């Protein structure tokens, strides 16, 4: 919840700073989607330690910055590949630090590589492809669909139970997203340079 809250806060502030509009309908949709996320994730959750909470907030701000930067990108595939190359040394260094605390086998390593290099990379390329056509506020709200998709995947592939709470939470999120995306933010008029 801290992670999504940080992403929303940063990207909405960025959107408003850049001149995007936040009408009553869009604001209501944003609040409804966040309420749905809270209802989906909060029950049963415990307050994390301060350090863990700060790390989640930092991760949310980093993802917001990543998304904002992606709006100016031209080649989604090349940008994602470059980001993965730059992130690999950091990931390896962190893995070495925590190596003694984990358990490793061939299947786990292979699944991790498939998850990161295939599934995540494909999702990032798709996200970077869509971002240039989205405003910051719209993009931040669309990201709230991820927990709903993860929940659906758990039901379909892992036989997890589907409760009334999760159904209504997902409906609240999706309704909020529709409210935000249905009303398009007006583009800012471009000022023409005056001739001398």
Q: Model features per residue range: what roles?
A:
Residues 22-42, 89-92, 153, 165-184:
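Hydrophobic transmembrane alpha-helices of multi-pass small-molecule transport proteins
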Residues 19-27, 45-51, 74-77, 89-113, ...:
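Membrane-interface interhelical linkers
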Residues 2, 6, 28-32, 54, ...:
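Hydrophobic residues within alpha-helical transmembrane segments
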Residues 13, 39, 54-69, 94-154, ...:
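Hydrophobic alpha-helical transmembrane segments of multi-pass membrane transport proteins
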Residues 13-64:
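Compact, aliphatic and Gly/Pro-tolerant "microcore" segments centered on a short helix or tight beta-hairpin
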Residues 39-48, 100-104, 156-165:
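Helix-coil boundary and interhelical linker segments in multi-pass alpha-helical membrane proteins
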Residues 65-87:
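Juxtamembrane helix-loop-helix junctions in multi-pass membrane proteins
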Residues 6-28, 148-167:
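C-terminal transmembrane-helix exit sites in multi-pass transporters
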